From Swiss-Prot:
Lineage, broadest ranks: Bacteria, Bacillati, Actinomycetota, Actinomycetes, Micrococcales
Binding site for Na(+): 76, 79
Protein name as catalogued: Fluoride-specific ion channel FluC 1
HAMAP family (alphabetical): FluC
Catalytic activity, as annotated: fluoride(in) = fluoride(out)
Keywords annotated in UniProt: Cell membrane, Ion channel, Ion transport, Membrane, Metal-binding, Sodium, Transmembrane, Transmembrane helix, Transport
Length: 137
């Protein structure tokens, strides 16, 4: 891996983190609830985008450098499963057990489903289209 790729991954990670900060701030201001809606939305959308990027990369042979920049860099900076874990523990400590369980387990299933959906849709986008039937004999 070249120094330029490492720099690009770092920049993309910073941009992903800024996108996370902005989206989380917008969601917190619009829906002031104890449930971590922003973190959930970020992790689910990030998982979807990573699934989509992965399928598109595999189907189009995206170079490994670009996979690192987009997946490890941007999406890695954007998603935040450590914050989700912290928020689940925080909710449990506050005796909000249902919200803690929903945050911990629910986010995992939602993120896995979103990643699978992204992989599937990305696979459809790169799947070869069958040739049209011939109308001539």
């Amino acid at each position: 891996m070249t120094p330029l790729v490492v720099l690009a991954v770092a920049i993309a990670g910073g941009l992903g983190a800024v996108a996370r900060l902005v989206l989380d701030g917008v969601l917190r201001s619009r829906a002031p609830v104890s449930f971590p809606l922003g973190t959930t939305a970020i992790n689910v959308t990030g998982s979807f985008v990573l699934g989509l990027v992965t399928a598109l990369a595999l189907g189009h042979g995206l170079p490994p450098e670009w996979r690192a920049i987009l997946g490890t860099g941007f999406i890695g900076g954007y998603t935040t499963f450590s914050t989700a874990s912290y928020e689940a523990v925080r909710l449990a400590q506050q005796r909000q057990y249902r919200a803690a369980l929903l945050t911990g387990v629910g986010m995992m299933f939602l993120a896995l489903g979103a990643a699978g959906l992204g992989l599937w849709l990305g696979g459809l986008a790169v799947a070869p289209t069958p040739p049209a039937p011939s109308t001539t004999l």
